From Swiss-Prot:
Residue ranges, annotated region (Disordered): 109-155
CDD domains: TLP-20
Name of the protein in its database record: Telokin-like protein 20 homolog
Xref: Pfam families: TLP-20 (PF06088)
Source organism, top-level taxon: Viruses
Length: 155
């Protein structure tokens, strides 16, 4: 269950750029203090920083660094702010240092997609006639096959 009686955040994290290259930027969010978390939801306060502005410009992937999941939301009113909920899967999870990462993809670079591989056509066996994919213009559509019935069903 979420702790709703407290007005302070469970965890405070600060964003820093871990790697920046042509493909994008890897942001790492580090906790300022060590925390021992119980199972359930915990609010994570993200300190506003210019590094978070890049998240508004392109897609990003979330990477958890422990036995928990998290949900990351951008704030429309503040391009340098974010809201995070962390969901601990079990009791007594120690959180310190790097808590989670976000991989921000470069939106200015053209979209790179994995290559689409078409299945290779199977060569026809020797002496066998290859199937035609579509009927030719003069061909009639194939007629439906008739079902054989027993003598009792025919009566």
């Amino acid at each position: 269950m979420a702790n709703t009686s407290s007005t302070t955040s469970d965890i405070v994290v600060r964003a820093r750029v871990l790697i920046a290259d042509d493909e994008g930027t890897l942001l790492e969010f580090e906790a300022e203090n060590e925390h021992c978390l119980m199972r359930g939801a915990h609010e994570v306060r993200v300190i506003a920083s210019p590094e978070l502005d890049a998240l508004h410009n392109g897609p990003y992937n979330e990477i958890a660094l422990g036995d928990y999941t998290f949900h990351f939301n951008l704030v429309a009113a503040n391009r340098f702010g974010a809201q995070v909920m962390l969901f601990a899967k079990r009791d007594d999870i120690k959180v310190s240092g790097a808590v989670f990462r976000l991989k921000v993809w470069n939106s200015k670079k053209r979209a790179v997609a994995p290559p689409h591989h078409e299945p290779e056509p199977v060569p026809a066996e020797e002496g066998a006639v290859a199937d035609r994919a579509e009927p030719e213009s003069g061909d009639a559509p194939p007629s439906p096959k008739k079902q054989k019935l027993d003598e009792r069903e025919q009566d």
